[in-house]
Amino acid sequence: MKTPNFIESYQTEQYDFCDRVIARLEEYISSQDDSNVAMHFMNGSVTNGGEQSRRDYSFNFQAMQDPLVVEMHEILRQYIPNYAEIYNGFGMQGCMSETMKVQKTPPKGGFHTWHAEHARNESASWRNLTWTLYLNDIPDGEGETEFIEYGMKVQPKKGLLCFFPAAWTHTHRGNPVYSCDKYIATGW
C-alpha cells in the first residue's frame, strides 16, 4: 500500500528465521568474555564524540556466505520489488548491503537519539534504503520505531519487515522497551 511518507511494512511469515537469528546472537553474546564485549557490542558505550549514548548489544554478520545473511537477502528479494513498484523511480539498484546488523536491546536500554541512516561520513554515505526486520513481539507502547516528521510509530511485531529511505527526511529513533528484550535485524 502506497503511503505518502515512503514508510512501508510487510508482515512476513519468517518466524523460524527470526528465532534462529535471535539464537545465533544469544550464542555469540554468551561466548564473549568481558575483554571482547567492547569490540563487538555497545554496552553502555558512547558514540559520535559523546553526543549519542546507547546501551544495547549488536553484532554485524558480514560474511555474505553466512547462511543467515544469505537467507535474509532472499527474504529482502521477496519484498523489495513490492516497495520499488509502489515508489517507481526510487532507485533500488544496489540497495542491499552485505552486512546484516542484529541488535538486542534490554529493558531501559537502546539508542533513543533522533538520527538518520544516511550520513556524510564515508561509512554511511552510500546508504539509500533502510530495512528492519523485527525478530520478536513487543508489548504495545514499547520499543516502537518513531519517525519525527510523520508523527508515526511502527510497533515491533515478530516477522514485520519495514522499509524506509535512509535520508534525513526519515529521521527516527527506537523508543525504550521496559518489559522485555527487543531484537531486530537491520541493514541498508
Task: Describe these PLM feature segments.
Residues 1-92:
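Non-heme Fe(II)/2-oxoglutarate
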Residues 70-188:
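Catalytic core of non-heme Fe(II) oxygenases with the double-stranded beta-helix
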